[in-house]
């Protein structure tokens, strides 16, 4: 028997079904992928995309819009691009790239996107911040007048670094650039300065070794390691310094002090050159794109010392009366000591000074291999501790005179007494500037060594016994005048009483002959 349906029932059922459907209008800007090659995607149809915007691709993959052309967009993929195909849907997100920030990152190793890669579980960070940010304006900045101690006598005495300064570390490969920066990070233990170490284009084994050394020396607890290793894409190597800078700025904005090491910006420039050439941007000098100067200047200008007003405004009054700082130690690798190449000259002109490390000095056993003649700190002098500033003036003069006379003495057979004394003093100063790796020196010990050589107490000590003498002298003062050593380390002051104590202590130690 056929079933009969009442037309009114059918219409009621249809009405009920239509009313139950929840429709929402969503405006979405979509395009389609036209090509994928070498980490670069070309997308057709994204009319409203912004420069630097995140573009969503299938399989939870994102790309960064870099080239906005008349009818297509050139974007660089952040992560794996093997699964992308021509015709895939690309969507705009309306967001720019952000990374996690906060104290939760201290002691962790993350990639350029802020994702943990150390196997210690999730970060637990609750805040994020954009990787690109405009540097603090002139009105919000304060002059650099507080020191960052690296623990190296040669640097702290002759090329002092201040909080908020940008000091370039430049030299050929295998001259101790990373060692100097890592020792500076280790020396911040107990000072309250938070550190960020950005490894760009390095071997994964090298990064693992650095992390292990930081852990062994108790420095990982105050350090964030951002790693974009050689096996990662050019996009990750390009982004990583900006991500690390954002993590450091978190502390600066809240009235704290931070130190960031970019190791090294030469590899970032190479990664950016690769991206630019793949995006068909016109090449310039050494095939770098025209904006390679801006690549580094916008990064390094974010390192600053900001005023109390800036911190108060940023924290909405939660933090008052405190200045913040971000000190940058960018590293540049030169080829055969050529500091006049494109990227080195760019970074030299952006920074507030440079520490030049030389292969010949390194091979001669003078480590750190600092060339005191062409190394300079343009603003750090105002930040030097009183005691080091007072004592270190003679060091530079002794070394400059020694270099001049040493060249002359090669041709002269008979030297007068004054010249011979200057040569011997210069030899001792050069020897005294040597220092072992992972052994940063306190302010008091540095001052003691410099005072001893300046006042001629080392003139009768054989050059090959100098470092043993220095070690014994430091131990003698730690045992007999521990209170004075602690006072100098905490205040950095200098007066006649301290000078008298130094004089008496050194003379006492010399009589023991225990070196």
Curated annotation (Swiss-Prot):
The organism's place on the tree of life at top rank: Bacteria
Positions contributing to ATP binding: 171-178
Topology relative to the membrane: Peripheral membrane protein
Protein localization: Cell inner membrane
Catalytic reaction(s) noted: ATP + H2O + 4 H(+)(in) = ADP + phosphate + 5 H(+)(out)
Keywords assigned by UniProt, alphabetized: ATP synthesis, ATP-binding, Cell inner membrane, Cell membrane, CF(1), Hydrogen ion transport, Ion transport, Membrane, Nucleotide-binding, Translocase, Transport
Identification of the protein by name: ATP synthase subunit alpha
């Amino acid at each position: 028997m056929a079933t009969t349906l009442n037309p009114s029932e059918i219409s009621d059922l249809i009405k009920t079904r239509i009313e139950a459907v929840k429709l929402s209008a969503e405006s979405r800007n979509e395009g389609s992928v036209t090509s994928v090659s070498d980490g670069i995607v070309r997308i057709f149809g994204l009319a409203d995309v912004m420069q630097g915007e995140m573009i969503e691709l299938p399989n939870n993959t994102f790309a960064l819009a870099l080239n906005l052309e008349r009818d297509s967009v050139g974007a660089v993929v952040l992560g794996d691009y093997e699964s992308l195909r021509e015709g895939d849907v690309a969507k705009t997100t309306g967001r720019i790239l952000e990374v996690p920030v906060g104290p939760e990152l201290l002691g962790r190793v993350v990639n350029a996107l802020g994702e943990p890669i150390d196997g210690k579980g999730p970060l637990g960070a609750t805040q994020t911040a954009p990787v690109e940010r405009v540097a603090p304006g002139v009105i919000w900045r304060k002059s650099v007048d507080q020191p960052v101690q690296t623990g190296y006598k040669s640097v702290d005495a002759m090329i002092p670094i201040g909080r908020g300064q940008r000091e370039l570390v430049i030299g050929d490969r295998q001259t101790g650039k990373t060692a100097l920066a890592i020792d500076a990070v280790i020396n911040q233990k107990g000072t309250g300065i938070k550190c960020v170490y950005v490894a760009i284009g390095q071997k994964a084994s090298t990064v693992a070794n650095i992390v292990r050394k930081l852990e062994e020396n108790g420095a990982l607890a105050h350090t964030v390691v951002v790693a974009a290793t050689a096996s990662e894409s050019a996009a990750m190597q390009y982004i990583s310094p900006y991500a690390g800078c954002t993590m450091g700025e978190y502390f600066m904005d809240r009235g704290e002090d931070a130190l960031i090491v970019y190791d090294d910006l030469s590899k970032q420039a190479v990664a950016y050159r690769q991206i630019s050439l793949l995006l068909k941007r016109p090449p310039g000098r050494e095939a770098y794109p025209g904006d390679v100067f801006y690549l580094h200047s916008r990064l390094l200008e974010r390192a600053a010392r900001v005023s109390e007003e800036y911190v108060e405004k940023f924290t909405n009054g939660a933090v008052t009366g405190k200045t913040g700082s971000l000190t940058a130690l960018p590293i540049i690798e030169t080829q055969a000591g050529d500091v006049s190449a494109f990227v080195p000259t760019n970074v030299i002109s952006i920074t507030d000074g440079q520490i030049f490390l030389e292969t010949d000095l390194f091979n001669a056993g003078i480590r750190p291999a600092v060339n005191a003649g062409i190394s300079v700190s343009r603003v750090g002098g105002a930040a030097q501790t009183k005691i080091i500033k007072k004592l270190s003036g003679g060091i530079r003069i002794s070394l400059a005179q020694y270099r001049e006379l040493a060249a002359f003495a090669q041709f002269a057979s008979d030297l007068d007494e004054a010249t011979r004394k200057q040569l011997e003093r210069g030899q001792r100063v050069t020897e005294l500037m040597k220092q072992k790796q992972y052994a940063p020196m306190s302010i008091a010990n540095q001052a003691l060594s410099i005072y001893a050589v300046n006042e001629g107490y080392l003139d009768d000590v054989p050059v090959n016994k100098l470092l043993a003498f220095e070690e014994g002298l430091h131990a003698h003062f730690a045992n007999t005048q521990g209170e004075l050593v602690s006072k100098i380390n905490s205040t950095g002051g200098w007066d006649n009483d301290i000078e008298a104590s130094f004089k008496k202590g050194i003379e006492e130690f010399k009589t023991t002959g225990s070196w």
